Amino acid sequence: EIHPFNAVTVDTVRSFDPKGIIFSGGPASVTEATTPRAPVELFKMNLPIFGICYGEQTMVAQLGGEVTLSDHREFGRAHVDVIGDCVIFEGVWKTGERHQVWMSHGDRIDQLPDGFRAIASTESAPYAAIANDDKQFYAVQFHPEVVHTPDGAKIISNFTHTVCGCGGDWTM
């Protein structure tokens, strides 16, 4: 199910008993006080969460990390260096490899929240992908949902199937 950020409450989420949550991207800057935020209670529901672009930034900011407005906006094709193994990369990417992705962001993550580690980086985005394996929180600065990230669908599938345990009886 898809729900807009401003119409979601924890009770709404509980009512459909999800196996995981995906925070999507968006054009806003997390550095502005009036931009979208996830309900804080979602982070306490013991559900896997996957953040995409703005979804990564808001996750980091809300969990105690640091996000700033970047001097270098990334837009278009980029190459990420895989710097850590992770369940969302299983069967897709390995540590030491470089892969094409699609970036579109103006914010920069400068410090991760406690418990997180970097799993991929670019020259200007040291936290292009992050993981907190204990909480099953994962996030990427790039856009796995677009065709310009060739392995993106596999990364999303690893989150939905492997991490969340969803069956394959639904479509994207």
Q: Residue ranges of each PLM-predicted region?
A:
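Flexible gly/pro-rich beta->alpha loop and the following alpha-helix that scaffold active-site loops
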Residues: E1-I52, Q57, L63, K154-M172
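Pocket-forming structural segment of enzyme catalytic cores
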Residues: F23, A33-I52, Q57-A153
